[in-house]
Amino acid sequence: MEMTMRWFGSNADKVELSEIAQVPGVKGVVGMIMDIPAGEVWPKERIKALKEEIEAAGLSLKVIESVNIHDDIKIGLPTRDKYIENYKETIRNLAEFGIEVICYNFMPVFDWLKSDLDYRLADNSQTMAFVAEDIPENPQEIIDRVQAADGGFSLPGWEPERLSEVKDLFEAYKNVDEHKLRENFAYFLKAIIPTCEEVGIKMAVHPDDPPYPMFGLPRVVKNREDLDWICNVVDSPSNAITLCTGSIAEDPANNVYEIMAEFVKRDRIPFAHVRNIKFLPSGEKDFYEAPHMSEYGSLDMYKILKAMYDNGFDGYIRPDHGRMIWGETGRPGYGLYDRALGASYLNGLWEALEKNKQ
């Protein structure tokens, strides 16, 4: 297991690489290039510069999150083949610089959804929350709300240039139901996985967040059955999963422990996001993102990591969203301090699992 932390780049992240390098046990960075629009090829020189910058700080770059998928691919438009070829070229370029895993999602319009990016806990720390009754019927209202609370940073999956076209996007997706989205996903995977096999990269899909339909948009990465379907569409180790414990567990019907154990054992989880959530009494699926420690949330983090360890997990892991604590400000979910605490906690659990096995 290699502990990492997500970093958005020197021009897009308040957290410095030198600060990440000081977090005990963190060996690498999960990187991205924020300003390349979906559908465009990632130039080799940009990838090379990112890798060199990260390695100069004493950290590794083995995972990219994310190479966003153009909506024409998800919708199934005739232009999708052009964007798929661009995606394949990006895969080759990333592999040339030692990238092993690409995390991505296949969600229409919104890459993730929360009702509140500034949810206050009893200790006055700030976190993100999802309360169903607080989600407006008009998607433009949630866009305005998110952009007003983004801390001055572009949020992944909520890039302003893309969301400025949200009305057109909803119109484009109006005839895309779950069956059609699944067909388009299969088309994409069958096209790119041979390239991944050729260059040694694992494409690792992130579960839908939340894992159920919103605004009438379909979801196809929402439960154990969907993950099994994805793995079987192209039966290859290169066709993999980024298991996000918080996202998959947002639906209480999903048994995150069993799902983690099964797909680690099947060697389909090269990368994991590990976070805790706390369900609220206001609704069955209402929750806030809790501190990583088990006692603060609804998930048993030891049980999650034990499922990973016992089934041979040897991939990359990162603490997922953290609270804003100790007066820190910045991109919601991605401050330094609480994620550093989360990384240390997860590393401690892993050390205990290793030593208990000896």
From Swiss-Prot:
Cofactor(s) this protein cannot do without? Fe(2+); Mn(2+)
Enzyme Commission code(s) on record? 4.2.1.8
Gene Ontology molecular function, alphabetical? ferrous iron binding; manganese ion binding; mannonate dehydratase activity
Which top EC class is given?
lyase
Q: Which UniProt keywords apply?
A: Iron, Lyase, Manganese
Q: Which GO terms describe its biological process?
A: D-glucuronate catabolic process
InterPro entries assigned to the protein according to its UniProt record, in alphabetical order? Man_deHydtase, Xyl_isomerase-like_sf
Q: In which pathway does it act?
A: Carbohydrate metabolism; pentose and glucuronate interconversion
Q: Which reactions fall under this protein's catalytic activity?
A: D-mannonate = 2-dehydro-3-deoxy-D-gluconate + H2O
For this protein, the record's NCBIfam families field holds: PRK03906.1, uxuA
Return the similarity comment: Belongs to the mannonate dehydratase family.
Q: What does this protein do?
A: Catalyzes the dehydration of D-mannonate.
Tell me which HAMAP family the record gives. Answer: UxuA (MF_00106)
Protein name as annotated: Mannonate dehydratase
Query: Top-down, what is the taxonomic lineage of the species of origin?
Result: Bacteria, Bacillati, Bacillota, Bacilli, Lactobacillales
* Encoding gene (name): uxuA
